[in-house]
């Protein structure tokens, strides 16, 4: 079976990752001891994508938990599903990265990375046919960003033909807990552009807006934000975990979603976003789901898709519904908003349907968009980066760990290149075709 090895790094990565395992264990009816209590073959049919089966019919997550300080991992271990993880797969240091990318990537993290790779090897060897890796981390801190990207490049070296997929939480000025976030994020993006196949950009700002506006929560906690992230991660991985009509694996997803290797940063979305109390009262219709799913307010990245164009889109519908209706609605959206889809990739919308809805909902939809509007997110980080870097503010924390200013300059220009590549494809052919049409019309008049 096609297995995935899951890695969670740093405080944010471990919190999101921990939540992800709670949600999918729940969907597959696996309790906190790893025992299956469900009654549906569908739940077990592809269980080994994410779980190893141990003696005594225990299911153990194929997860590796990494951090440079023990705190967060202790709280995962003492949490509701803490006992389900394999004890050997907790790998942690004592020093912490102090929100410093250089510590995570070059000094503290580099010392721990070999023991993580040993566990990665052990998990990979136990796989029948490994399809790839997924990493949950944030880009604003030190461990998830610095050590996370170090792990990615090391794993890439050792498994060059396996898919590397990340769920990356991008920092935002509205929800900031460190002043050096723009540095850490830019240095990380520099790595992600080169070394991952698919990156889901999750943005705290967007998550806060959803909690405020849509869910009407007055004081959203990180718990509420992580709840949204885990719903999205569960949706995105549905096709990998359940048999469906369109059986996706990580590679098929990449083939459908990534038209140019560097442009693999996706904007996730989820529907229905209803406050936790009111969701049972009425089931949404397929048109409503489709409408909501494409709505800018439902995007987990703080970018407005109406400011750009979609290169590719994947939608995953969950629940019992008519395939025909889903296809009609998806076509309907594309036809009505055709200017927001690039015309030089025909049929750039792919849809999958899975019969099993998430807990507590009759049906749901998850959205994955590769939109040129994601450049807004990189621009935002880049502006903050430049503001500080121009004055060399805080730079001594990084050079003190042996980094060179040159690396900052390279990362900055790589990110700016990424932005202009998105811009280039956003404008592609629309203008050229426009000029071309006029010539033709001119020819027609004669």
UniProtKB/Swiss-Prot annotation:
GO terms for cellular component: cytoplasm; microtubule. It comes from the Eukaryota. Keywords: Cytoplasm, Cytoskeleton, GTP-binding, Magnesium, Metal-binding, Microtubule, Nucleotide-binding. GO terms for molecular function: GTP binding; GTPase activity; metal ion binding; structural constituent of cytoskeleton. The keyword Cytoplasm applies. One of its GO terms (biological process) is microtubule-based process. Pfam families: Tubulin, Tubulin_C. Mg(2+) binds at residue 69. Tubulin is the major constituent of microtubules, a cylinder consisting of laterally associated linear protofilaments composed of alpha- and beta-tubulin heterodimers. Microtubules grow by the addition of GTP-tubulin dimers to the microtubule end, where a stabilizing cap forms. Below the cap, tubulin dimers are in GDP-bound state, owing to GTPase activity of alpha-tubulin. Belongs to the tubulin family. Dimer of alpha and beta chains. A typical microtubule is a hollow water-filled tube with an outer diameter of 25 nm and an inner diameter of 15 nM. Alpha-beta heterodimers associate head-to-tail to form protofilaments running lengthwise along the microtubule wall with the beta-tubulin subunit facing the microtubule plus end conferring a structural polarity. Microtubules usually have 13 protofilaments but different protofilament numbers can be found in some organisms and specialized cells. This is Tubulin beta-2 chain. It comes from Drosophila erecta. The lineage of its organism: Eukaryota, Metazoa, Ecdysozoa, Arthropoda, Hexapoda.
């Amino acid at each position: 079976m096609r297995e995935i090895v899951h890695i969670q790094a740093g405080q944010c990565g471990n919190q999101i990752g921990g939540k992800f395992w709670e949600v999918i264990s729940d969907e597959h009816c696996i309790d906190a001891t790893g025992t299956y209590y469900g009654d549906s073959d569908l739940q077990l049919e592809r269980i080994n994508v994410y779980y190893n089966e141990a003696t005594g019919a225990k299911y153990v997550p194929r997860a590796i938990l990494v951090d440079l300080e023990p705190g967060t991992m202790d709280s995962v271990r003492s949490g509701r599903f803490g006992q389900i993880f394999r004890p050997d797969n907790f790998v942690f240091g004592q020093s912490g990265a102090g929100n410093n990318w250089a510590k995570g990537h070059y000094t503290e993290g580099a010392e721990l990375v070999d023991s993580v790779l040993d566990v990665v090897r052990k998990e990979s060897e136990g796989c029948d046919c490994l399809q790839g890796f997924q990493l949950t981390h944030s880009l604003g801190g030190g461990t998830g960003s610095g050590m996370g990207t170090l792990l990615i490049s090391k794993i890439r070296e050792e498994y060059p033909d396996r898919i590397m997929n990340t769920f990356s939480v991008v920092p935002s000025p509205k929800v900031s807990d460190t002043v050096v976030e723009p540095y850490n994020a830019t240095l990380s993006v520099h790595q992600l552009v080169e070394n991952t196949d698919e990156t889901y950009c999750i943005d705290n700002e967007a998550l806060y807006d959803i909690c405020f506006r849509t869910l009407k929560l007055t004081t959203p906690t990180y718990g509420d934000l992580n709840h949204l992230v885990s719903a999205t991660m569960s949706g995105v991985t549905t096709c990998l975990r359940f048999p469906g009509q369109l059986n996706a694996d990580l590679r098929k997803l990449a083939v459908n979603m990534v038209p140019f290797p560097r442009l693999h940063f996706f904007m996730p979305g989820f529907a229905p976003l209803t406050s936790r109390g009111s969701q049972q009262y009425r089931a949404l219709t397929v048109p409503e789901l489709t409408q909501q799913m494409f709505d800018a307010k439902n995007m987990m990245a703080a970018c407005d898709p109406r400011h750009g164009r979609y290169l590719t889109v994947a939608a995953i519908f969950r629940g019992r519904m008519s395939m025909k209706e889903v296809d009609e609605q998806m076509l309907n959206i594309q036809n009505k908003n055709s200017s927001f889809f690039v015309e030089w990739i025909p049929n750039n919308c792919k849809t999958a349907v899975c019969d099993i809805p998430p807990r507590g909902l009759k049906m749901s939809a998850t959205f994955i968009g590769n939109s040129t509007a994601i450049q807004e997110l990189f621009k935002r980080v880049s502006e903050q980066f430049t503001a500080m870097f121009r004055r060399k503010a805080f730079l001594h924390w990084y050079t003190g760990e042996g980094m060179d200013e040159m690396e900052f300059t390279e990362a900055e220009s790589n990110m700016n290149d990424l932005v202009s590549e998105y811009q280039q494809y956003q404008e592609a052919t629309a203008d050229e075709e426009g000029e071309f049409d006029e010539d033709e019309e001119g020819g027609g008049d004669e």
